[in-house]
Amino acid sequence: MRKLILLLLISGSAWAQQTPVKKYGLQDFMMIEKVEDQDKYYNENKAQLAEKEDNSFRAELAVNWLAKGNLEKYNHYQAAQPKYNLIQFLNLTYALEKLFDEKKQYAAVARYTNEFLEQLKKGTLTDAVGRAHVLMDLNAAANAKLGNIEAAKAMIANSAGKKVASASDNGYFKDVKSNYLNRYAIVMSAAGEPKIAFDTLSKAFREADSNPYMVETFKDIYKQVRGSDKGFDQYLKSLQDEAYQKYYHKVEKMYVESPTLPLTGTMPHAKQPDKFLNTFLANKPLREITLNALDGKPVNLGDYNGKILVLDFWSTGCTPCVAAFAGFEKVVAEYKKSEFQLFVVNLFEPQAEVKVFAARKPVKLEILQDEENKAYAVTATPTKIIFDPMGNIRFFSSGYAGSTDREYYKLKAMVEITKHRNQ
């Protein structure tokens, strides 16, 4: 197996980060797909668990129940104050974001984030992945929603979220900058500063530092500033169109005019932009490549001649890989009636692990597997390759774009340019 050029802080699969497999080890526990079955497994076997394993199981159950929105179950397992490992803490922050953005459980988010911030302050919880600012931003926004304005203002002022969002390299975790801007705008709006919030979100959408959850926030703030929501849809579309055109012109320069095989993909060196690193090697036509779907059925890529085909290479432990999926989902939805196909191709990992990960997330995209990395010898994830209807490579790109909307704009532009130049 070739060594990956990691666009990661955390290497290997999520399971590789956990307690070694034992008879009742955490790895076995994590391979149970449904949290309901995990709960049953734990309660049937807890008497046989060592203290360390019992803690790991409780932490895993707390995270997974929270991700599902079952606060009663979460509270039950959190009551013992389990110690979270690195992956569990990361997943905990994702679950809290989901609780805020989708479930709108603001009181619970305010309470839970405050508890974890207190633990971080006392040193009983460790933030090894730099996500404390997410807890602070969520706490601020939740308090703003609850009318606790002074607490919200104090928390957002002390958060490192602005600094993290302003960093030149914020393309690791999903929607880092856009989430911060959304929560900052929520606080400013509640604090009687709707114009600041309006300008913040206008700029965010114009520059593609945006995601779908921000639309509702922006519409509420638009009504505060303009007196009604009349004209909002048109205004938002104008900002989104401006952002798309910007990335269309950037992407246009990446078009592969002469896609002769063999073709080596490259990416700029992170610290030496004038140097390039190889990311994949394409040395055979699509018709000679067959990969397995997640159900084990073979898929010959040559069957997609006549369609624009996108292959995105990923692994379960690659955080930016999975962060990009939300943008891909928007593209797939837009082209569902077109001659278009997108696969996310998992590398290096066995089918069982990928199936559990895909079900739990859930991953809504079609998955293929290349466990031995034979098709394109990929050396950097995430990497995507776009083929024209004749099977020629027309675009390739590595890395996560930094926001759901920017990822969507960039891939959509690649699809549109490929379509228009190959009619």
What kind of region is each of these model predictions?
Residues S210-E288, G302-Y304, V356:
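N-proximal helix/coil linker or "cap" segments that precede and/or mark the start of modular domains
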Residues F357-V363, D370-I417:
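Thiol/disulfide oxidoreductase modules built on the thioredoxin-like
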Residues N305-G306, F313-K330:
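Conserved redox-active cysteine motifs that mediate thiol-disulfide chemistry
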Residues V322-K361, D370-A375:
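Structural microenvironment flanking redox-active thiols in thiol-disulfide oxidoreductases
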Residues E288-L309, E334-Y335:
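A short beta-strand-turn-helix
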Residues D28-N43, V63-Y77, E102-Q119, N148-V164:
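Helix-turn-helix repeat elements of alpha-solenoid scaffolds
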Residues Q18-G25, L49-E60, Y84-E97, D127-L138, ...:
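Generic helix N-cap/helix-start motif at coil->alpha-helix transitions
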Residues D39-N55, Q78-Q88, E102, E118-G130, ...:
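Flexible helix-coil transition and linker loops at the boundaries of alpha-helical arrays
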